[in-house]
C-alpha cells in the first residue's frame, strides 16, 4: 500500500504526506528484517522534509534497536532531546507528544533489553503520559503492557500478569501478537506450559501473517523453550534452528547466537537417551561440550553474560556426562576436582548458584549435586538438591494462585528425579523423608491459598455456571452450540487469568525432620505413616512410626498404574445399579483380584512395619486415589490420605472437637436419587442444620450458607476437570459450583463431605503436584474432605453417609468414623463404597 502511495502523483506534491509514507514504509521494512532499506528510506525523508527530524530519529532508533545495533540508544537519546527542545520552544509541527511517546516507548524497551529496569520504567511511564496527551490509545496500551513486562523481569510474575491483563482491557477486541508473546514468557516462567504454548501460537500466527521476522524469531525461541520444559527435544531443536536462520538472515548475530543456545539445550536433553556404544556416547557428549564452550565464548563477547553462563553450564554437563557415562555415581578425577577440568566445573557451577535467573540456579544445583555424587559424597550432593528445591519453593510462595504454585513445580523436575535416586541409594529414611517433603507436592509447604473476595470474579463464575450448564444440556440433547462453548472457554480463560494476578505470602514451611515426625507419632500411640512414592521404574515406601522408620523398595510402577486404572474402571462399572448380574459378577471378581494384587505389591511388604492403629497414607502420585480401605491388608484399619508427611503429622493435632459443632450445611443437587432424602436425614441428626435442596440449592445459596469452620455435606453429581482442578465442581440447581468459588469465600468449612460423586479422582502435574477438586479444597484451607475416588451408587452413598454422621456425633474423628461405617456397609450390600478420607485427620 505504501509503495502504491509513493507512485501516486499527489504524494510527491505534498512533502508532509510523502515523508509520512516513507516513514511508514521504513517501519514495515524493519519489521520484515530489511534494516538497510529501512534506514535508506529514513534518510530520504530528511531530503524531503527536515521538520520530520524527530520522527526520523525515533524511527531510526527503533530500526537499529530491532537489529540490536549499538547506535540505537544514541539515536533515541537524540530524538528525545530534540523533541524536548521543540516542546520548550512550542514548535511542534509533526513533532509533538505523539513522536515523544514513541521515542520514550522504544527507549524504554532498549533499557529493558539492557537490564536497566529503573530507567526502563521511568521512560515507559513517561510514554504513557505523552501518549495520553497525544490521544494515542494504542501506545498507551503498549506502554502499560511493557510496564507489566518490566514487573516480569523484576521477578513479580503475578504483578506482571495483572498489569498485562489491565493493559489488554484498553483494546479488548484486538488480538495482538507482541502482548501474546510476552504473556507466554510469563506463563512459561510460572510453569504453565500448555497456556504458554497457546499464547505462543497466537504470536506465531500474528508474526507470520505480518511478516514480522524479528518477532517471529523471538516467538520461535519461546516455543523452543516450552518444548524443552515439556521434555520434547525434537520440536525444540527445529524451532531453535529456524529462529537462528531468521535472525542470521537479518543480521542480528546476538539473536542468532542465543537461538543456538536453545538448540544446544535440546541436544543435552536428547543425549541421555541416545543410542550407540559407550565410546560413541562419550564422543557425542564431548562434541556437545566443545560446541557449548565455543558458544559461551561468543555470548560472553557479545555482553550476554547470563546466556554465556547458561552455555557454560551446558558445557560442564556434557563434560561430566563424558567423564561419568551419564551416571551421577561414577567417580572420575575430573568430577573429584583433582584435575583442571574438575576445578573449572565446580567454579562454573558455583557461579550458576549465584545467578539471578531461577532456571540457571536450578541447573547449577543439579550439576553441583552431580559433582559431589561422582566424587563419592552423597550427603553433600543432597545438600545441593535440597537448596535448589528450597529455592523453587520460595519462588512458588510468591504466587497467590494454586494454578501458578502447582505449575511452577515443573522447574524442579530434574532436581527431584536426582534427589529420588540419590536418597533411595542411601537407604536412609531421614534422607528420603527430606527429599519427599521438598520435591513432591511442594505446595503443601506453602500457606493455604485464600484469594481476596472479588465481585468481578464472582460475576464471571456465575456467568460460567449458567453457560456451562446450557452448553452441557445442548450437548446431551445432540445439539451442540458452538457459540455457547466459545463463551464457556472465554469465561474460563478470564477467570484463570484473573486468579494468576494474586500475590502470595512468600512464606515457606520448613520440611519436617524424621525425628520430629516420630515425636509427634509418639503422642498418638499406634499411628503409622506410610509414604508411597514412585520413580526409577518402581514403587517405594517409607514407613514411619514412633519406634522406627524403614524404607522398602516395592514392585514395578507400570504394573501398579495399570492395576489402579483397572480398579477405577471396575468401580465405575459396579456403581451402576442396572448392571446385569452376570456382568456384575465378572466386574466384582476383577475388582477383588486387582485389589488383592495391589495389596500384595504395595501393603503386604510393609504391613509388618506398621503399628496396629490408624494409617496415614501419603501419596501424591497415580495411586493417591485408590480406595485404600478396600485393600485386603488395610481392611478394617483407620485410613486417611494426604499429599505430604508434614500435612499428615499436622493433622494429628487438629481439634478434637468435630467440625459439626460449628454448624452443618446439607445440600442436595439435582438428579441424585434419594439425594434430598439423604441430606434431610443427615440434617435431622444435627441441631440447627441448614438444608438447601431443589431450587434453593444454588451456587450463591451454598456459598452464603457455609458455616465457618463447620461441616458441609453435599449430595450432588460432580465434574472432574483434569487440566485445572479449580474448574472441577459439583452440579447444583443453577449449574456447577466450582473450586474457584470456594477459595475466596469469606467463610470456609473445616470439613466437606461429598457423598455422590467421584471428585476424589486425581491427576498429576509434572513436578509431582496433585490435581483435583479435593487437592484444591485442601490447599484452600479445608482440613478434611470425604469423597469417592470413583463412581458410587446413590443407594450406597445414602447408607454410608447417614452412618458416617452418626459416628461423628458419637465422638469419632472423620477417618475413624468413615472406617466404622465402611465396615457396616460391607455387611449390608456387596456394592463397593470407594469413599476416602482426605486431609490431616485420624
Predicted regions and their residues:
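Residue register of alpha-helical TPR repeats
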Residues: 16, 20, 55, 62, ...
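Single-residue signature of alpha-solenoid repeat helices
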Residues: 38, 72, 120, 160, ...
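Amphipathic alpha-helical protein-protein interaction segments
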Residues: 327-350, 359-363, 377-635, 660-665
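Catalytic cores of enzymes
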Residues: 516-578, 582, 586-842
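Residue at a conserved register position within TPR or TPR-like alpha-solenoid repeats
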Residues: 22, 29, 64, 104, ...
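Residue-level detector of the short coil/turn that links helix A to helix B
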Residues: 33, 67-68, 115, 155, ...
Amino acid at each position: 500500500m505504501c509503495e502504491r502511495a509513493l507512485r501516486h502523483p499527489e504524494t510527491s506534491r505534498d512533502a508532509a504526506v510523502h515523508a509520512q509514507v516513507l516513514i511508514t514504509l521504513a517501519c514495515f521494512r524493519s519489521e520484515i528484517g530489511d534494516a538497510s532499506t529501512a534506514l535508506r528510506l529514513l534518510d530520504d525523508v530528511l531530503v524531503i522534509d527536515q521538520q520530520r527530524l524527530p520522527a526520523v530519529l525515533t524511527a531510526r532508533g527503533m530500526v537499529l534497536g530491532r537489529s540490536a545495533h549499538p547506535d540505537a540508544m544514541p539515536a533515541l537519546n537524540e530524538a528525545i532531546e530534540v523533541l524536548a527542545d521543540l516542546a520548550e520552544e512550542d514548535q511542534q509541527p509533526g513533532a509533538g507528544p505523539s513522536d515523544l511517546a514513541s521515542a520514550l516507548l522504544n527507549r524504554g524497551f532498549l533499557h529493558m533489553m539492557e537490564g536497566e529496569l529503573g530507567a526502563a520504567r521511568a521512560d515507559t511511564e513517561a510514554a504513557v503520559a505523552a501518549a495520553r496527551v497525544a490521544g494515542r490509545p494504542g501506545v498507551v496500551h503498549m506502554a502499560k503492557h511493557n510496564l507489566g513486562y518490566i514487573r516480569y523481569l523484576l521477578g513479580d510474575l503475578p504483578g506482571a500478569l495483572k498489569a498485562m491483563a489491565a493493559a489488554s482491557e484498553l483494546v479488548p477486541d484486538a488480538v495482538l501478537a507482541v502482548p501474546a508473546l510476552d504473556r507466554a514468557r510469563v506463563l512459561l516462567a510460572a510453569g504453565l506450559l500448555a497456556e504458554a504454548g497457546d499464547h505462543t501460537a497466537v504470536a506465531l500466527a500474528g508474526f507470520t501473517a505480518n511478516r514480522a521476522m524479528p518477532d517471529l524469531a523471538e516467538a520461535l525461541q519461546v516455543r523452543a523453550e516450552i518444548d524443552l520444559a515439556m521434555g520434547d527435544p525434537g520440536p525444540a531443536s527445529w524451532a531453535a534452528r529456524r529462529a537462528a536462520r531468521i535472525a542470521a538472515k537479518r543480521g542480528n548475530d546476538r539473536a542468532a547466537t542465543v537461538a543456538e543456545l536453545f538448540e544446544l539445550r535440546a541436544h543435552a536433553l536428547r543425549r541421555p537417551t541416545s543410542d550407540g556404544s559407550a565410546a560413541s556416547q562419550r564422543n557425542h557428549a564431548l562434541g556437545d561440550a566443545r560446541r557449548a564452550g565455543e558458544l559461551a565464548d561468543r555470548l560472553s563477547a557479545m555482553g550476554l553474560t547470563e546466556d554465556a553462563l547458561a552455555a557454560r553450564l551446558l558445557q560442564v554437563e556434557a563434560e561430566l556426562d563424558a567423564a561419568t557415562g551419564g551416571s551421577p555415581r561414577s567417580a572420575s578425577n575430573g568430577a573429584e576436582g583433582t584435575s583442571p577440568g574438575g576445578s573449572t566445573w565446580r567454579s562454573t557451577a558455583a557461579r550458576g548458584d549465584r545467578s539471578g535467573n531461577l532456571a540457571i540456579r536450578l541447573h547449577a544445583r543439579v550439576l553441583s549435586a552431580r559433582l559431589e555424587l561422582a566424587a563419592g559424597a552423597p550427603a553433600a550432593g543432597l545438600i545441593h538438591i535440597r537448596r535448589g528445591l528450597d529455592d523453587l519453593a520460595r519462588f512458588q510462595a510468591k504466587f497467590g494462585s494454586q494454578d501458578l504454585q502447582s505449575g511452577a513445580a515443573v522447574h524442579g523436575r530434574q532436581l527431584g528425579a536426582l534427589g529420588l535416586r540419590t536418597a533411595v541409594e542411601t537407604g536412609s529414611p531421614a534422607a528420603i523423608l527430606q527429599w519427599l517433603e521438598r520435591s513432591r507436592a511442594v505446595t503443601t509447604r506453602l500457606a493455604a491459598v485464600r484469594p481476596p473476595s472479588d465481585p468481578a470474579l464472582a460475576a464471571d463464575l456465575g456467568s460460567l455456571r449458567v453457560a456451562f450448564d446450557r452448553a452441557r444440556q445442548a450437548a446431551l440433547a445432540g445439539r451442540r452450540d458452538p457459540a455457547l462453548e466459545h463463551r464457556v472457554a472465554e469465561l474460563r480463560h478470564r477467570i484463570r487469568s484473573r486468579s494468576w494476578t494474586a500475590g502470595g505470602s512468600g512464606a515457606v514451611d520448613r520440611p519436617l525432620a524424621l525425628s520430629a515426625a516420630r515425636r509427634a507419632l509418639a503422642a498418638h500411640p499406634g499411628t503409622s505413616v506410610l509414604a508411597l512414592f514412585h520413580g526409577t521404574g518402581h514403587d517405594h515406601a517409607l514407613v514411619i512410626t514412633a519406634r522406627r522408620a524403614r524404607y522398602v523398595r516395592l514392585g514395578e510402577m507400570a504394573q501398579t498404574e495399570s492395576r489402579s486404572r483397572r480398579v477405577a474402571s471396575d468401580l465405575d462399572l459396579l456403581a451402576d445399579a442396572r448392571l446385569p448380574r452376570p456382568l456384575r459378577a465378572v466386574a466384582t471378581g476383577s475388582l477383588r483380584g486387582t485389589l488383592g494384587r495391589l495389596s500384595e505389591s504395595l501393603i503386604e511388604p510393609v504391613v509388618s512395619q506398621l503399628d496396629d492403629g490408624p494409617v496415614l497414607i501419603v501419596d501424591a502420585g497415580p495411586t493417591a486415589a485408590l480406595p485404600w480401605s478396600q485393600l485386603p491388608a488395610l481392611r478394617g484399619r483407620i485410613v486417611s490420605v494426604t499429599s505430604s508427611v508434614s500435612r499428615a503429622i499436622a493433622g494429628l493435632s487438629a481439634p478434637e472437637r468435630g467440625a459439626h459443632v460449628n454448624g452443618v450445611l446439607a445440600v442436595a443437587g439435582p438428579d441424585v436419587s434419594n439425594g434430598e432424602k439423604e441430606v434431610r436425614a443427615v440434617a435431622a441428626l444435627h441441631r440447627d442444620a441448614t438444608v438447601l435442596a431443589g431450587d434453593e440449592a444454588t451456587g450463591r445459596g451454598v456459598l452464603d450458607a457455609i458455616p465457618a469452620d463447620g461441616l458441609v455435606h453435599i449430595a450432588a453429581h460432580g465434574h472432574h476437570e483434569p487440566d485445572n482442578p479449580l474448574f472441577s465442581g459439583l452440579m447444583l440447581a443453577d449449574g456447577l459450583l466450582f473450586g474457584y468459588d470456594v477459595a475466596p469465600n469469606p467463610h470456609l468449612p473445616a470439613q466437606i463431605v461429598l457423598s455422590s460423586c467421584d471428585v476424589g479422582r486425581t491427576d498429576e502435574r509434572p513436578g509431582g503436584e496433585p490435581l483435583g477438586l479435593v487437592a484444591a479444597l485442601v490447599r484452600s484451607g479445608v482440613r478434611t474432605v470425604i469423597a469417592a475416588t470413583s463412581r458410587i451408587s446413590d443407594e450406597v452413598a445414602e447408607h454410608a453417609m447417614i452412618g458416617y454422621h452418626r459416628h461423628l456425633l458419637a465422638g469419632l474423628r472423620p477417618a475413624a468414623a468413615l472406617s466404622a461405617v465402611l465396615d457396616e456397609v460391607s455387611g449390608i450390600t456387596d456394592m463397593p463404597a470407594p469413599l476416602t478420607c482426605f486431609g490431616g485427620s485420624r
